[in-house]
Amino acid sequence: DHLAARRRTDLQQLLPAGPKIAFTGGADCADHAAIWDALDRVRAKHADMVLLHGGGPRGAERIAAAWADNRGVTQIVFKPDWTRHGKAAPFRRNDQLLQVLPIGLIVFPGSGITDNLADKARALGIPLFDFRPKPAPA
């Protein structure tokens, strides 16, 4: 739709240059080595990448933020607006992050909010680098 396209164009002008790579993972995910390795592999292909994440205070997103600080990678943090959106805040945050149209999404284990972001990204045709455990065959 026209308004969404215009909003996206306006948003793109405000963002730093470089391919946008989104990252998501839960507060209980603490696999530093795997997260740093995944981010290093993506950065090897996209040296000027910009990391998009939810700014979680602990867990996978905190580890990704520490990686970006260490590697000098630009970050854009999409924090949930709890005051404005209440319980829907993390889902609205997911929608805002995807409006940037990242070229890929790195997914580590998390909650239903993590799965929601992965599902929406897949529906938009955004490639997933999925590090969640595979379900056991039934």
Task: Give the predicted meaning of each segment.
Residues 1-21, 29-138:
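Acidic/glycine-enriched connector segments
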